[in-house]
Amino acid sequence: MMRCYRCGESKEDNRFRPNQPYWNRWCLRCERTPTGVLPLPQEKEDVWRDSDEVSPT
């Protein structure tokens, strides 16, 4: 479990992009939210997947 430095919520490690610097750890939900806006609602897509796991659409 890690804590997002923007929304302050503790989340599973797969909700964060790997290799982020420890001083700027944002969850994927906060990364896709524009600056100056409250974080968007959590979605199933807000989970980190390796490029080989992603299915082409």
Curated annotation (Swiss-Prot):
Task: Name the gene.
Answer: ninD
Q: What is this protein called?
A: Protein ninD
In terms of superkingdom, the source organism counts as Viruses
Family named by the database record: Belongs to the ninD family.
InterPro entries xref list: NinD (IPR035346)
Q: Please name the taxonomic classification of the source.
A: Viruses, Duplodnaviria, Heunggongvirae, Uroviricota, Caudoviricetes
